[in-house]
């Protein structure tokens, strides 16, 4: 009951939940999402991506699947890889329909500045242990207000290993967020770790 669970809307990895005929701009002929590599190339070349309507249909299928599996609404929604207008607009429509808060880069809250980052991945390029030193040594400065560190800790199964380019980083993230040394440093510096549930209060 203490775990704050959200929906990570994905339109670039694996099979879509919606039937492929309903979301033609998102998937290939097998119903598999076009990859983030393809999407980033399209963005770089100023090519059209996908329609807002297709993104909305898929996001709706995903939130309904979440409700089926978890038995309740997600406490927040965020976006996987792409933060582009058609996807943001689609997810905002989901927010209005289900009243579930949306978290994305560039967001702003009245109660303070948000610094949202994945800066640890730059740190990992030159370090393969003692990841908590990213904070302790000041590589990442925690600012006044709300700071969001986006991490990807978790179990790496066959599907993840064969579809994701982020494997080593997941292991490093797990080591970082479970570090007792980091937890003690946060306590010593009176830095509170909160969930999105606390932000909504």
Describe every region a protein language model picked out:
Residues 1-4, 21-31, 67-68, 140-143:
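Acidic (Asp/Glu)-rich catalytic clusters
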Residues 2-8, 74-78, 101-102, 146-150, ...:
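Structural preference for beta-strand elements that scaffold enzyme active sites
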Residues 8-14, 80-82, 107, 118-123, ...:
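Active-site beta-loop-alpha junctions enriched in small/polar residues
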Residues 16-49, 165:
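Active-site gating loops and adjacent loop-to-helix segments of metal-dependent hydrolytic enzymes
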Residues 52-119, 133-136, 140:
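Catalytic domains of cell-wall/extracellular-matrix polysaccharide-remodeling enzymes
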Residues 99-101, 136-157, 192-194:
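Aromatic-lined glycan-binding groove of carbohydrate-active enzymes
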Residues 102, 164-201:
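C-terminal domain-boundary segment and adjacent tail
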Residues 120-133, 162:
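A conserved mid-domain beta-alpha-beta active-site/ligand-binding segment of alpha/beta enzyme cores
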């Amino acid at each position: 009951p203490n775990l704050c669970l959200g929906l990570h809307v994905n339109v670039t990895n694996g099979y879509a939940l919606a039937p492929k005929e309903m979301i033609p701009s998102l998937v290939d002929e097998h119903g598999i999402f076009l990859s983030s590599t393809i999407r980033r190339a399209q963005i770089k070349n100023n090519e059209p991506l996908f329609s807002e309507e297709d993104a909305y249909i898929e996001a709706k299928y995903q939130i309904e699947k979440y409700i089926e599996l978890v038995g309740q609404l997600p406490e927040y929604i965020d976006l996987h890889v792409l933060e582009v207008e058609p996807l943001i607009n689609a997810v905002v429509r989901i927010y209005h329909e289900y009243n579930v808060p949306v978290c994305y880069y560039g967001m702003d809250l009245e109660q303070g500045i948000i610094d949202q980052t994945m800066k640890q991945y730059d740190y990992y390029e030159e370090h393969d242990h003692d990841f908590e030193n990213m904070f302790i040594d000041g590589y990442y400065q925690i600012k006044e207000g709300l700071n969001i560190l986006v991490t990807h800790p978790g179990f790496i199964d066959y599907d993840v290993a064969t579809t994701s380019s982020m494997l080593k980083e997941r292991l490093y993230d797990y080591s970082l967020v479970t570090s007792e040394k980091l937890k003690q440093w946060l306590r010593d510096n009176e830095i509170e770790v909160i969930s999105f549930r606390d932000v909504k209060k």
